Structure formats: structure tokens, C-alpha cells
Amino acid sequence: YETLKQVLGFHEELAKMEQLDFDPVRMEKAYNQERSEWQSLFSKEDKGMEEDKPCWIAPDLSEEQWQDMCLPGYWERNGLKNFDGVVWFRRSLEIPAEWIGKPLKLNLGMIDDEDITYFNGVEIARGAGYMTPRTYTIPAKLVKAGKAVLAVRVSDFGGEGGIHGKAEELY
């Protein structure tokens, strides 16, 4: 504690801890409350949500105005410098007839910080943790031949954000 007091950038957090008498239960509760408020603010700023419902997951949504981003990679290195918030990614793909009715494995590599992943407008998974690999299963009942759309809502709360890792980990 005494050492951290000497380091720039810790004063505000240490003052909060002092106010809570360094009680771990109270500190965790305060942290969770602060994080919840912050996430709520992010959601309000998210143009891909309308009345807390995702509007950019529809398979027939026009992508004409969307920009491309090279993945994997942090978005700060791909045109979104110093950005914390929500970014939506979409990818269209063709499902061959031999895959109909079979569960599919989806590997998104690592995502910083959180994601909600949709397949053809249906939420299939949520993940959290900036160094946690995301491997999901697309349920067999959703797998139909033809065009399919994968939409991923990525939230970043600080530092670098995005779908990152190794290219061979995305499949």
C-alpha cells in the first residue's frame, strides 16, 4: 500500500479503497457497481442496439456502409486509435449442403474484452476475458445451406480491444 501511494495513477483508486476500509466485500461490491454503470453507458452509446435489443444481427442487413477491418488484430492498430467501447463485426459465409443439420465449431481466437456472438440473427454465445480463447458451437438446428451471417458484438473497457490472436485460430 505505501509503495503504491508513491506511484502516479493509483491515488484515486487507493482513496476509494481507504473509504471502504479495505474491506474486500465492500470493495468488490463497489467495483461491480461501477463496472455495471460503465457497461450501461457503453450500451447506450452502441448504435447496434435499439431499446436494449440488437439491430445489427439480421442476416439481410445491408453492409454497404460498413468498413472492413483486418482480423485478427486489435482495433487500435486498425484505424480506431484510443477507442474503448463497442464494435460490431459481421461476416457472410456460404454453408454447403453437406453441413445441414450438423453442429458447427466456431473458433474466434481471443477477444478483448467481451463478446456476444450471433449466427443468422440468433445469439449462440457470450464470452468474457481478454486472454480467453472463444470456441463456440453453432447448434445443428441453425445450420442450413446457403448464405449465413455471423455477427459479433465486441466490448472493450480499456486498453486495446478487438478480435486478436493468431490467424490460424479463427475458423
Please identify what each model-predicted range represents:
Residues 1-77, 130, 142-171:
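An acidic-aromatic loop/edge-strand motif
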Residues 58, 66, 93, 99-121, ...:
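Aromatic-lined ligand-binding clefts that engage carbohydrates, nucleic acids, or primary amines
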Residues 81-93:
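Non-catalytic, beta-strand-enriched accessory regions in extracellular/secretory proteins
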Residues 82-84, 99-100, 129-131, 143-145:
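Surface-exposed coil/turn segments at beta-strand junctions on protein surfaces, enriched
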Residues 86, 108-110, 129:
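Short solvent-exposed loop/turn micro-motifs enriched in small/polar/acidic residues
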Residues 89-91, 132-136:
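Short strand-edge motifs at loop-to-beta-strand transitions and within beta-strands
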Residues 124-125:
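Short hydrophobic beta-strand segments in globular cytosolic domains
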Residues 138-140:
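Short, hydrophobic beta-strand segments
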